[in-house]
Amino acid sequence: MNDACFSIVAKDCARDELLVRARRKGDIEKVFPKAKVKRNAKADYLYRARIKKDVVVAALKGEVDRITYSNFKSSVTDAKLHAAYLRVWGNLGPLQENWDEWPMFKEF
């Protein structure tokens, strides 16, 4: 997503739920406004919410339907999130075949 970043796993929740985890306050609520988000200072992801699977599916479908951009990185307006995504993009680049042949990517 271009305005929030979180992880979704099937951990520590009921069979009909998923655990949505985020590092930044507010990211979960951007997509799941009714979520009961808890902060856990001892966890690698500070913010967590158990959310029903059908709610997750509907929300993610809504996010897909909302896509209008032709370039993901250019659509991210939050500077801190953009910088994080850019680092991930650069780190994943070498997984692509012939990545090192692209001169513009030599800096990564």
Model regions and ranges:
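Structured alpha/beta or helical-core interaction and ligand-binding surfaces enriched in interleaved
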Residues: 1-108
